[in-house]
Regions:
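Pyridoxal 5′-phosphate
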Residues: 1-183
Length: 183
């Protein structure tokens, strides 16, 4: 993996980022190192402001957005929270361009949860799965569709509205993942 991919994939870059980051870390160190009990209120308040900013960007309802250490950890928590048997005998649909660790997770959990993993292939020479190809594979047998809203590797953005409508038509559970800071 090249350094440019790592930087592009993992973190946003902008002018004066180092200065802004140094200031934020200095403020955190000052608060966290004070000899009082205000550290957790500060840290949790900062976290909530971060969540509220993302919620506003996403135009999401109050208390509907949270943070997680990783996309894969969040997706695992979602899978583990499903009612027992929800996926048994059904399919989980993912694109070949989904976050690789989520694909590995699903491969490993298929037997335990009793589902078949269906991976929508890339077209010859394509860097991302086309929306219509994903929709063509979405049948009533799909119990969960993992939608990658914005790909971390190609920046391709799916037509989320079309995907939601399909999920509603089949009464399937859809998980929207956006590993570029939105997931």
């Amino acid at each position: 993996m090249s350094d440019s991919y790592f930087l592009y994939h993992s973190i946003g870059m902008y002018p004066n980022k180092a200065r802004d980051l140094a200031g934020a870390l200095a403020e955190f160190a000052f608060v966290w190192g004070r000899p009082d009990d205000g550290q957790w209120a500060y840290a949790l308040g900062t976290r909530q402001r971060f969540i509220d900013r993302w919620r506003a960007i996403l135009n999401a309802p109050s208390q509907s957005v949270t943070t997680f250490e990783s996309v894969t950890g969040a997706f695992h928590a979602l899978l583990a929270s499903l009612p027992p048997g929800h996926l048994r005998g059904r399919s989980v649909l993912v694109g070949a361009d989904c976050f690789p660790s989520n694909h590995f997770l699903l491969q490993g959990m298929a037997a335990k949860y009793g589902f078949t993993l269906k991976t929508v292939p890339l077209r010859q020479g394509a860097a991302h799965v086309e929306d219509e190809d994903f929709l063509d594979h979405w049948t009533p047998q799909v119990g969960l569709a993992l939608l990658t809203w914005i790909s971390s590797t190609t920046s391709h953005r799916i037509d989320l509205g079309s995907m939601w409508r399909m999920g509603g038509a089949w009464a399937a559970l859809s998980a929207r993942i956006s590993p570029k800071g939105r997931g």
